[in-house]
Amino acid sequence: MAKYTNDELLEAFGEMTLVELSEFVKAFEEKFDVEAAAPVAAVAAVAGAAAPAEEEKDEFDVILSAVGDKKIQVIKAVRAITSLGLAEAKALVDGAPKAVLEKAKKEDAEKAKAQLEEAGASVELK
């Protein structure tokens, strides 16, 4: 039986499509009676245990609390931030308090908050 190096195997896998790789993984699991997802679950459990030690959030929801006097500017800001159409952005603004962005990176959330506040809206980061 020929022995392949890791580099040769990686090169071969790199030439396969995702469907072919998926079929390979299934065949490998059946042949060796293993499950590819098991190590990932263990790593996720370890990562989950370490997460409470971190106090700083890295994902934020940008909540439009109140529109203020400059509704048109707020709608324009919402459209620029979210790429929504005019009707969708107006509905979002009219429905305040509502989330403009969900699970946004800290810098993106702060930038969106600044844009909305500049347009005259009241904004919260959660």
Curated annotation (Swiss-Prot):
The keyword Ribonucleoprotein applies. It comes from the Bacteria. SUPFAM superfamilies: ClpS-like, Ribosomal protein L7/12, oligomerisation (N-terminal) domain. The keyword Ribonucleoprotein applies. GO terms for cellular component: cytosolic large ribosomal subunit. It holds the Pfam family Ribosomal_L12. Keywords: Ribonucleoprotein, Ribosomal protein. GO terms for molecular function: mRNA binding; structural constituent of ribosome. GO terms for biological process: translation. Forms part of the ribosomal stalk which helps the ribosome interact with GTP-bound translation factors. Is thus essential for accurate translation. Belongs to the bacterial ribosomal protein bL12 family. Homodimer. Part of the ribosomal stalk of the 50S ribosomal subunit. Forms a multimeric L10(L12)X complex, where L10 forms an elongated spine to which 2 to 4 L12 dimers bind in a sequential fashion. Binds GTP-bound translation factors. This is Large ribosomal subunit protein bL12. It comes from Bifidobacterium longum subsp. infantis (strain ATCC 15697 / DSM 20088 / JCM 1222 / NCTC 11817 / S12). The lineage of its organism: Bacteria, Bacillati, Actinomycetota, Actinomycetes, Bifidobacteriales.
